[in-house]
Amino acid sequence: MQMETIALPKICVGRRRLYLAQVPIPFSKKSRRNVVRQTSDNGEQTRKSTRVKLRPQKDWHKRNYLAEVLIPSLFVKRAGEYTPPEFPVIEPGQVCITWIGHASFLIQTHELNILIDPIWSKWLKVVKRLKKPGFEIHHLPDIDVVLVTHAHFDHLDRRTLRKVAADQPIVVPIGVGNLVHDLGFQIVHELDYWQGIKVGPVEVSLTPCYHWGARFLADLHRGFGGFAMNIDGRTIFHCGDTAFFPGFREIGEHHHIDIALLPIGAYDAPTGREVHMNPEEAVRAFQELNAKTLIPMHYGTFRLGYEPMHEPLERLVVAARAHGIEQKLMVLTEGKPVVL
């Protein structure tokens, strides 16, 4: 696996950090000069297609997402409370994980703060957020690097990214850089599957998944994936969005996952397509990864499928018990840091 190293000397300006990343900038186009795309050893891109079929399933139109889910959600009171987080002091060898909500996580080590798929917005265009983030965005610590798994609106929220950008690096899949290059990040790194980058002491690698990356209708060129983060000898895996696919076993063999952040919601999709794992498939993926701890995500925040908001977690607990992994399941509360 390729690994590029970024040195991150820091200059503190108030609570904002400036990062002097020692990385060449190979593009001359001024508006996107901060986008760096890593290539394979022979200079070619190594993208492999693991895109789901985008054609809706038969009879999908017989259900009405607008009438059954979207409009009723507008009248649901947004749940949750903003609570100032109590971030602990992280000792060497420890890692602190804070679930913010949906697929957003703050990963902290004693040297680095990593923010993944951050979204604080109350709306995804017309889809209402039904659960508040665990804390307000100004309670975030200084962020050293941001990771975005793909360009879908519930994972790449430009409004949130603009607020957290403070001249630090951001890492995205191939083809996503032009969506974030103008938001205030010092450098944008585009990765292909199995490519990696070293940010300070943490190794970050892009892993395959079974999904798609278009933000609109015609931009199917955009990449998508998950991130494996090697932190002090332990690997945390953020799956991104995915349906179940055979690649989980390969990811587990390649990265030796300790903590798996796996999506469990939005499986009853409006189009009928299988684009997200259900809770039972998440348990199966966890077993294929041969991971040690399962932390569920991508549920309870936005109602992106027909299933009730409470159903994914209830089904996950039942499935975990049925497969004998209940002790490996760790359900987080939004905004509550957990040290592992």
Range-by-range predicted roles:
Residues L8-N113, K336:
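Zn-dependent metallo-beta-lactamase
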Residues P118-S121, H150-A151, C209-Y210, G240-T242, ...:
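Active-site metal-binding loops of divalent metal-dependent hydrolases
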Residues R37, G43-R51, V145, P169-V171, ...:
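Cap/insert and terminal regions of metallo-dependent hydrolase folds
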Residues P72-P92, V172-R234, E314-L340:
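Metallo-beta-lactamase
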Residues V76-P92, I100, S104-A151, R158-K163, ...:
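Pre-active-site segment of Zn-dependent metallo-hydrolases
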